[in-house]
Structures are given as C-alpha cells and as structure tokens.
C-alpha cells in the first residue's frame, strides 16, 4: 500500500501532529493503546498508509517526533495518545533552539539530525511502496523552522523521487510569539521553495478569526486552533486513507495543483464550520458545503482569495453524496466566479470524493487552493524582515551560530522573487504569452 511517513518537528509541529494522530486514530477506530475497536472493514482497508501493524495486532503510527528540548515530548508522552507512538521514535535534544533558526539548522539541529534520519530510514524500510513524507512544523520558531527545513533537505537527498509535503504554520500579522519570527520564516521559505512539493500554509491569525467569527468561541485556546488544523489535515489525507469514488494521492494532488514548481504554497479551508449553537439551523447539502468552502472566511491562511486568482483548486468531499451534484456545484462556482480563476488553465478544479465522513458530521469538505493571493502572506513577512534587517537588529544571534549575512540577503531576494512570480501569473492572460515571446526576441536583438 502507498505509505506515508510522518515527521513532526518543534513544539508547534508536535502539538499539531499529535492532534492529527488523535483525529485519524478516532476515524480508523484505533484506541489509545493502539488496539482496533472499530466497527467497519473500511477502517482497516488502507490503514497501512499511516500505521504499521505490530506482531501483537497493535497499530503504531509511522511517525517520527523531533524536538530540541524534552518538554513538548514529555507532554505528548503523558498525553492521552502518548502510548500509541513507538518509544524509539521520540528524538529530542536537551538544549532547545531558543527560537533561533541558525541553532535549529546549523548547530544544535545538525547534531541531532542523523539520529532522526535513522528513524526515518527505518520507517521507510518497513514500507512496501513509500509514497512520500509529511512534516508538521511552524516557521516562526527555531526547531520547526530551522531543523525542519534541514530534515527536508536531507530527506530530499536520500529520497529524491518521493513527494515531500509540509503543513507549515506561518507567523501571523497580528499575533506574534517571537520578535525574530520574520527572520526565521524568511530563511525557512527560502528552503521550502526549493525542497518541497506541496506546502499547506496555515496561519494562527486566520484560525483565531475562524474561532471568533464562525465558531463563536470567546476565548479560543491553542487546542481549538490545533483542532481546526487537524480537521484540515485529516481532510487532505482522506482519499489516501479511505476508499472513495474519485481518489487522489500526494502525487496526483501535486500534479494537479502545481503549475510551476516554485508555486506550491496552498491555502487550505474546511467546511462545515458552524457554531455549536446554530448547528441545528443549517442543512448540510452539497451546495451549502461548496458555498462555505470557497468563502474567504473559511481560509486557514490570513490571505483574501478575492485579492488574487486561483491557479488551481483541489477539493475533497466526504460523506455519502451524489457525484453528479458535486460536479454541477463545482461547475457553477467556476462559471459564476470565473474572474477569480486564471483562464489559461481550463478546468482547474480537481474533485475527490470519499464515502466516509469525519466523526460527528454527515458530510464535510476540504478545500485546497493554489491562489496568487498567498503572496500577501509572503509580502507581509518580507516587510517585517526588511524593517529589522535594514538595522541588522538581532542578527548577532544568527551570525554567532556561524551564519553569514549573505544568507539573509539571498533568502530575502528569493522570497521577493516568489512574490513577483505570483503577481506575474495573476496578471497573465491567455494571449499575452505570445507577446512575452516577442519581447524576449527583441531583447536578444538589442543585446
């Protein structure tokens, strides 16, 4: 079966990752000790995508848990699903990265990275046909961003033909945890652009907004935010884990979603999101789901898709529903909002349908959009980055770990290039390609 190896790095990555395992263990009927307590053969049909089966009929997540300090690991281990994970797969240092990308990438992280790769290699060797890797991490801290990107490039070296998929928590515009977030994020994006096949951009601020506005929670905790993320992650991976009418795997997703190799940063969304009190007033229908899924308020990244255009979209519907209705709705959305889809990629919406809904819902849908509006997110980080970098503020923490200012300059220009690439394709029309070629010819003549 097409297996996926899951890696979670840093505090944020471990918390999101653990929540994800709780959600999918629940969907597959696996209890906290790893025993199967489900009631449907479908739950076990493709369980091997994420779990290894031990000799004692225990299902063990194919996951490596990585951090540079023991704290987060301890709380995972003492948490409800702590006994589920393989004890050897907890890999942690003692020093911590102190929110410093250079520590995670070059000094502390580099010392730990080989033991992580051993675990990853071991997991890969147990696989029949490895499909790819998924990493959960944040870009604002030190371990998830610095060591996470180090792991990506090392794994990329060893498994160049496997899909590399990340769930990356971006620093938010208003909610900041660390002052050096813009540095850490820019240095990470610099790596992600080159080394991953698909990156889901998740943003704490967007998650807070969803909790406040839509779910009507007055004081959302990180637990609530992580629950939203895990709902999305569970949705994105549904068609890998359950049989359905139209299936996608990581590679199919990548092929359909990434028109140009560098532009692989997606905005995820999820529907239905309803406040607990108003659930009984809404009917879950395919049109309702589609409507909500494309709504800007449902995006998990703090970018407004109305400010850009969709290059491609993938949607995953879950639950018993008619394919015909789904197709009609998708067509209707595209026709009605055609100005928000680039016209030079016809039929740029891919649909997957899976028969099994998430726990507690009759139907649900997950949205993955590759929109040029994501540049807002990079622009924001870039502005904060240059404001600090201009004054060389906080740089000594990074140069002290052996980094060079050149690296910062490179990372900054790479991110600015990314922004202008998104802009270029946002403005592109069907016919302007020919003019572009003519311009190139003229330039050559002038030279």
UniProtKB/Swiss-Prot annotation:
| Residue numbers bearing the Phosphoserine modification | 172
- Give the main location: cytoplasm
Q: Which PROSITE patterns match?
A: TUBULIN, TUBULIN_B_AUTOREG
On this chain, the residues bearing 5-glutamyl polyglutamate are: 438
Q: Is NADP one of the keywords?
A: no
Note whether Phosphoprotein occurs among the keywords: yes
Which cofactors does this protein require? Answer: Mg(2+)
Query: Cellular location of this protein?
Result: Cytoplasm, Cytoskeleton
What Pfam families does its record include?
A: Tubulin, Tubulin_C
What residue intervals hold the motif MREI motif? 1-4
Q: What does this protein do?
A: Tubulin is the major constituent of microtubules, a cylinder consisting of laterally associated linear protofilaments composed of alpha- and beta-tubulin heterodimers. Microtubules grow by the addition of GTP-tubulin dimers to the microtubule end, where a stabilizing cap forms. Below the cap, tubulin dimers are in GDP-bound state, owing to GTPase activity of alpha-tubulin.
| Homology family | Belongs to the tubulin family.
Q: How does it assemble?
A: Dimer of alpha and beta chains. A typical microtubule is a hollow water-filled tube with an outer diameter of 25 nm and an inner diameter of 15 nM. Alpha-beta heterodimers associate head-to-tail to form protofilaments running lengthwise along the microtubule wall with the beta-tubulin subunit facing the microtubule plus end conferring a structural polarity. Microtubules usually have 13 protofilaments but different protofilament numbers can be found in some organisms and specialized cells.
Name of the molecule in the record: Tubulin beta-6 chain
UniProt source species: Mus musculus (Mouse)
Q: Lineage of this protein's species?
A: Eukaryota, Metazoa, Chordata, Craniata, Vertebrata
């Amino acid at each position: 079966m097409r297996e996926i190896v899951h890696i979670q790095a840093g505090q944020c990555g471990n918390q999101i990752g653990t929540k994800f395992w709780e959600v999918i263990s629940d969907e597959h009927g696996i209890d906290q000790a790893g025993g199967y307590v489900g009631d449907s053969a479908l739950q076990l049909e493709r369980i091997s995508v994420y779990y290894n089966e031990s000799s004692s009929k225990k299902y063990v997540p194919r996951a490596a848990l990585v951090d540079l300090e023991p704290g987060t690991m301890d709380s995972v281990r003492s948490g409800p699903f702590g006994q589920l994970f393989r004890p050897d797969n907890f890999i942690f240092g003692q020093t911590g990265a102190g929110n410093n990308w250079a520590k995670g990438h070059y000094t502390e992280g580099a010392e730990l990275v080989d033991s992580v790769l051993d675990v990853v290699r071991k997991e890969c060797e147990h696989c029949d046909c490895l499909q790819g890797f998924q990493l959960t991490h944040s870009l604002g801290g030190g371990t998830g961003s610095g060591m996470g990107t180090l792991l990506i490039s090392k794994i990329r070296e060893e498994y160049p033909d496997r899909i590399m998929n990340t769930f990356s928590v971006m620093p938010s515009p208003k909610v900041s945890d660390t002052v050096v977030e813009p540095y850490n994020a820019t240095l990470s994006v610099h790596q992600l652009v080159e080394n991953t096949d698909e990156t889901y951009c998740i943003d704490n601020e967007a998650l807070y907004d969803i909790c406040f506005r839509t779910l009507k929670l007055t004081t959302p905790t990180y637990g609530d935010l992580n629950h939203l993320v895990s709902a999305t992650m569970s949705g994105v991976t549904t068609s890998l884990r359950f049989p359905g009418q139209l299936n996608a795997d990581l590679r199919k997703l990548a092929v359909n979603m990434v028109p140009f190799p560098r532009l692989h940063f997606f905005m995820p969304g999820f529907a239905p999101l309803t406040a607990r009190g108003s659930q009984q007033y809404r009917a879950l229908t395919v049109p309702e789901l589609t409507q909500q899924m494309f709504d800007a308020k449902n995006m998990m990244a703090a970018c407004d898709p109305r400010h850009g255009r969709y290059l491609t979209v993938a949607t995953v519907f879950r639950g018993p529903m008619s394919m015909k209705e789904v197709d009609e709705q998708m067509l209707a959305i595209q026709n009605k909002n055609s100005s928000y889809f680039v016209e030079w990629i016809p039929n740029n919406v891919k649909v997957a349908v899976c028969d099994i809904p998430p726990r507690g819902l009759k139907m649900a849908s997950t949205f993955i959009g590759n929109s040029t509006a994501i540049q807002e997110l990079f622009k924001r980080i870039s502005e904060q980055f240059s404001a600090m970098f201009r004054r060389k503020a906080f740089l000594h923490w990074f140069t002290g770990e052996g980094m060079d200012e050149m690296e910062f300059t490179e990372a900054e220009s790479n991110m600015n290039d990314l922004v202008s690439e998104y802009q270029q394709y946002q403005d592109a029309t069907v016919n302007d390609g020919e003019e572009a070629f003519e311009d190139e010819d003229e330039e050559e003549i002038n030279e």
